[in-house]
Amino acid sequence: MKVVAITGKRECELVDRPDPRIKGNYVRVKILVAPMCTEFHQYRDGNPGDCLGHEAAGEVVETAGPARVNVGDRVVVMPQNGCGKCRLCLAGEHIHCQTPIDPLAICGTPTGRATYAQYCIQQDWLLVPIPEDLSYDHAAMACCGLGPTFNAMELMGVDRFDTVLISGLGPVGLGGAVNALFRGARVIGIEANAYRAALARSIGVAAVIDPNDPDARAQIMDLTGGLGADKSVETSSAQAAPALLAEATRPKGHLASVGWGGPIAASRIVGRGLTIHGAWHWNHFLHTDRMMHTIRGTKSMLDRTITHQFPMSRV
């Protein structure tokens, strides 16, 4: 099969690798859509390798035996590999599994872990069925495009009465805006990139603040009647972002971190009575119907946030 390999700084090519083998509860999936996530850092920095991509949507083409899915099923491929046996996995929180398994150890195949490829393998319980009325493009957003911030909205209980502040309006932050807007919330963004800011405004974000502006916090306070945002989500991983959100979230408000940025002083958390949430991915045991309902209701916004589409042959 063909897979994408990074060969140098801003250089990549298609290379031939063996088709992945499956065993046990593993399933082989033909990749039809693979969103771009953090892999661009590796491309930009020139870190060589051919294990790229951790999310996808595609079609089941082979099972090793009786499985929860069938050949021909359309599925979203969940990221990571939980053990499937621990308390977290059994509760649908496989992303936090402390004893993840290595597909290589189970299937004996060096390929199949990456999604920038023609095929990948995944355990059957980590494949989410795609409803007939959703396209592969839209369904693929159930991973990092919408998933982490969907979890943040669930944890914080975002609704139409909230003003939600989102720091970082890249692919994950824009997904946060889509999630919050679908729930009827008013959204304020923090973003320095003009293209991303304009894209956010085009889907309904009320205002976008430049984090490099020394008056950024004051502008947020002005937009929230001097109180601060009801709920905040950090997606940028910028070192200063969590502290800014802690200052710009109202007392007794909620702050969810999707990004892996800098610290928040305990005095800010306690003094403002903030509830802090860590949000990495969504619970597909509990919330699959809600996730698909969100995708179904935000197709027009997703069509804007899916800015570019390329065949793998153009890599």
Language-model segments: which ranges?
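Short glycine-/small-residue-rich Rossmann-like dinucleotide-binding loops
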Residues: P35, A64, S237, G259-W260, ...
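Glycine-rich cofactor phosphate-binding loops and adjacent beta1-alpha1 units
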Residues: M156-R160, A198-T275
